[in-house]
């Protein structure tokens, strides 16, 4: 169980550092389109929600998953803003200015962590839980309008949206294929 919690902390730190590096690269490269695409992907809500599902999956048990989901989100946010402030990439007030994200991580993390624990099941409910992240990854760019209004042709959000849709469809296909193969 300790190893699982260490992995949860590693996931949190990893996403925080990735997002911070993406922001730094976008600034350093004067908003280069490729750097902006990576930044949009790193900041995608479905990616941050996905880490809560992964945390729940890592710790396995429902009670632990209900703790791991919010913990990974909160730890990622705090790590992002503290490292950002220490490196001068974000202001020290960043954490206080974004209390809404902390509340969202705490509240949404509980059910998302539980989805992760459910995803370990080998029945239909487990398969359904494993489809939550791919579905969210597909739906986010559609719901946020990233694929409309001419952005698809070259705008960073359009490209990131397309990447998310393709990744989500591929992830969903893997879940469905695995479910079909294991049910034989």
Q: Language-model segments: which ranges?
A:
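Membrane interfacial helix motifs at helix-loop boundaries and amphipathic/re-entrant anchors
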Residues: 20-47, 78-104, 124, 138-163
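Internal alpha-helical transmembrane segments of multi-pass membrane proteins
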Residues: 61, 65-70, 117-138
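Alpha-helical transmembrane segments in multipass membrane proteins, preferentially the mid-helix core
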Residues: 106-126, 140-146, 170-176
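Structural signal for the C-terminal ends of transmembrane alpha-helices
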Residues: 54-63, 119-120, 173-179
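N-terminal topogenic module of multi-pass integral membrane proteins
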Residues: 1-70
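Hydrophobic core of alpha-helical transmembrane segments in multi-pass integral membrane proteins
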Residues: 13-22, 159-179
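Hydrophobic, membrane-inserted alpha-helices
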Residues: 48-54, 109-113, 166-169
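Membrane-interface capping segments at transmembrane-helix boundaries
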Residues: 1-5, 173-184
